[in-house]
Swiss-Prot record:
This is Small ribosomal subunit biogenesis GTPase RsgA. GTP binds at N135, K136, A137, D138, G184, Q185, S186, G187, M188, G189, K190, S191, T192. It comes from Neisseria gonorrhoeae (strain ATCC 700825 / FA 1090). The keyword Nucleotide-binding applies. PANTHER family: SMALL RIBOSOMAL SUBUNIT BIOGENESIS GTPASE RSGA, SMALL RIBOSOMAL SUBUNIT BIOGENESIS GTPASE RSGA 1, MITOCHONDRIAL-RELATED. The gene is rsgA. GO terms for cellular component: cytoplasm. PROSITE patterns: ENGC_GTPASE (PS50936), G_CP (PS51721). The keyword Lyase does not apply. Residues 10-21 have a biased composition (Polar residues). Its EC number is 3.6.1.-. Binds 1 zinc ion per subunit. Residues 85-242 form the CP-type G domain. Monomer. Associates with 30S ribosomal subunit, binds 16S rRNA.
Amino acid sequence: MPSEHPFSDGISTPNPKETMNDTAQITAGYGRRYIVRTPDGTTYEASTRKKRVDFACGDRVRISPVNAEQVVIEDFLPRQSLLYRQDAWKTKLIAANVTQLLIVTAAVPSPSVRLLQRALLAAEAAGIRAVIVLNKADLPETALWLEKLKFYETLGYPVIETRVLENADSLRPVLQGHSNILLGQSGMGKSTLANALLGSQTARTGDISAALDSGKHTTTHARLYDLNGETQLIDSPGLQEFGLHHLQAADLPHYFPDFRHLVGQCRFHNCTHRAEPGCAFKAAAETGAASPERLAFLQGITDELLG
């Protein structure tokens, strides 16, 4: 009769490999090298077969043992979500199985509306709840940026203000019960927020970097932490661009909360929402029911994907 344990070799002699769980979660990734954690909390260094790179931080995976400290990742388990970006040349997986994206922004240095809108689109496409975090809210330059962010509140995206001296306490209720990821431009204070939320856990990241011989600070790679038994947090590297080439142009209106209710209401089924008569999108922008700038953004992304 076959053994019930997936790693058993049928020999009765105790073997440390047999105690290893056959599933794990990726908590950090450096190229084709990973750190995984099994349900009992044990961590292992992990590699992949055939130089696969289609794994992301947060992935739940099947593993096979190599020795007491190392495993091989065989495949990932079905994903609840996948957040990634893609330009004309390459695809970058950001995180898997997250339920909430926190886009960290601040008035200083210059915030990017382009990056914010693109990240929101990616979250909508992935079925991930999005929250905008206005960091450094005590800066005098904040008022003008906050006024711009209030528009996104009208679209259903909460805007949470944080200040360094508050130790990120205003974020904790928002994070609770979610698998969260912090994402934002470089210089927005994202790492400071993460450190405030994680406390002593950040001291362990140096050991992980050394174990993988990365020679780099771990903020150059996504890293997953447990805030409590119900809440996870992924700290991701800062970025300046968010390619959306993985999206389909025809699906874009569904990812705009301010336009999705108009899908199917144009006179022509193949309306490009530009010069056609009877365009519901144009009518909404002209009457003030929708933002002309948002319509221009939709048109621009459509051109980008079709070009």
